[in-house]
Amino acid sequence: MKFASKKNNQKNSSKNDERYRELDNLVQEGNGSRLGGGSCLGKCAHVFKLIFKEIKDNIFIYILSIIYLSVSVMNTIFAKRTLNKIGNYSFVTSETHNFICMIMFFIVYSLFGNKKGNSKERHRSFNLQFFAISMLDACSVILAFIGLTRTTGNIQSFVLQLSIPINMFFCFLILRYRYHLYNYLGAVIIVVTIALVEMKLSFETQEENSIIFNLVLISSLIPVCFSNMTREIVFKKYKIDILRLNAMVSFFQLFTSCLILPVYTLPFLKQLHLPYNEIWTNIKNGFACLFLGRNTVVENCGLGMAKLCDDCDGAWKTFALFSFFDICDNLITSYIIDKFSTMTYTIVSCIQGPALAIAYYFKFLAGDVVREPRLLDFVTLFGYLFGSIIYRVGNIILERKKMRNEENEDSEGELTNVDSIITQ
C-alpha cells in the first residue's frame, strides 16, 4: 500500500512538473535556433511561444490579476475623490465604511458562508487573530486616509509600489520565504525607479503635495504587510471562511478606529489637525456632510489654509462607490492570500502602480483629480513592467526547482520501497 501511495505521489508530481519540462523544451529549441543561426522572425516566434505557454498555464491567476487591478485602481481613485470632497471628516468616513462592510459581510456570510464552512471552523474562536488583523488594518486605513489627503495622484502610484520590497523583507524574516536572485533584481529595478522619480519630483513645486503626508502614506504599507501575513498564517492552519474573516475584522475595526482617533490631534497634520474639544463637533458635521450634503467649512479654507473646503454635494455617491470597490478589493485580496500566498499577492499588486498613474489621465475615471500625461510616467511604467517581468522569471525558476526536488524525493522513495520488497 505504501508503495502504491508513493507511486501515485510520483504521478502527481510528474503531472505538476510537466509544464516546466515543456518550458525547458521550448528554451532548448530557442537555444538550438540561435546556435543554428535562426532568423530574427524565428527568434521572435520562439519568444511568443514562451509567453503564450506561460499565460496558458497560469490563465486563472492572470484573469484574477486583471480583475484585481481594475478593482484596486478604482478603489484608490474613489478614495482620493472622497477625500477631496469630505477630507475634513476622515474619521467619519472610516467608521461609516467599516459599519457598511460589517453589515454586508455578515449578511452574505449568513446566506452563503455557513454552508461552505466546516464545523471545526464554525465553532472555533479566532477573536485574537481577528483583533490583530483589525488593529493592523485600522492603523493602515487611518494612516492612508491622512496620507492621501496631501499626496498627489502620480506620487500615490509610486509610493504604493514600495509594498513590494516591504513584503519581501518581512515575508523573508517572518514566514521564511526564500527568493531567487531575479526576485531581488526585479524588486531593485522597481525601487530604483521609484527613487529616481521621487528625486525628480522633489525639485518640483507642487502645492497639493507634502513630503510629511507622503511619509505617512508610506508608513501605512507596513501594517498592511503584517495584516496580510497574519491572514496567510491563519489560512494555512485553519480553513476560515473569507466572508467570516472580513465581517469580524470590520466589526473589530469599529472599535480599533476609535483607539486611533487621538492621532488626529497631532499638530503636524495641519489641515487635518483636530483639537480634542472639536472632535464631537467634527463628527456631527461629518455626518451632516456625508448624508445631508451640508457644507460647514466654506470660509477661510482651501489650499494652503488651515482647513480644506467642504464639497458635500453628492459626496454620498462618491463614498458609496469607494465602499463598493473597497469591499471587492478586500474580498479579492483575501482570496489571493487564501488560495495562493502573500508572495503571489505581492506579485499581483505590483502592477497597480503604472495602471493607476495612467488612470489619472482620464477624466471619466479620475473626475476632479485628473492629471496631465507626463513623459516621466511612461518611464516609470517601463521600469515597473520590466522589474515585474524579472521578478516573475525568478518565481518560475523557484517553482521549477521545487517541483524537481519533489520528483527526485519521490523517485528515491520509490526505489527504496522496491528494494525493501525485493529483499523481503
From Swiss-Prot:
One of its GO terms (biological process) is amino acid transport. Changing C350R: No effect on chloroquine and piperaquine binding affinity at pH 7.5. Decreases piperaquine binding affinity and increases piperaquine transport rates at pH 5.5. Decreases chloroquine binding affinity and transport rates at pH 5.5. Residues 50-58, 280-292 dip into the membrane without crossing it. GO terms for cellular component: vacuolar membrane. GO terms for molecular function: xenobiotic transmembrane transporter activity. Disulfide bonds join C289-C312, C301-C309. The record marks E207 as: pH sensor, predicted to act as a hydrogen acceptor for interactions that may accelerate progression through the transport cycle. Not involved in the proton transfer pathway. It is found in: Membrane; Vacuole membrane. Residues 84-89, 148-152, 203-210, 264-279, 293-314, 362-374 are vacuolar. Monomer. This is Chloroquine resistance transporter. The gene is CRT.
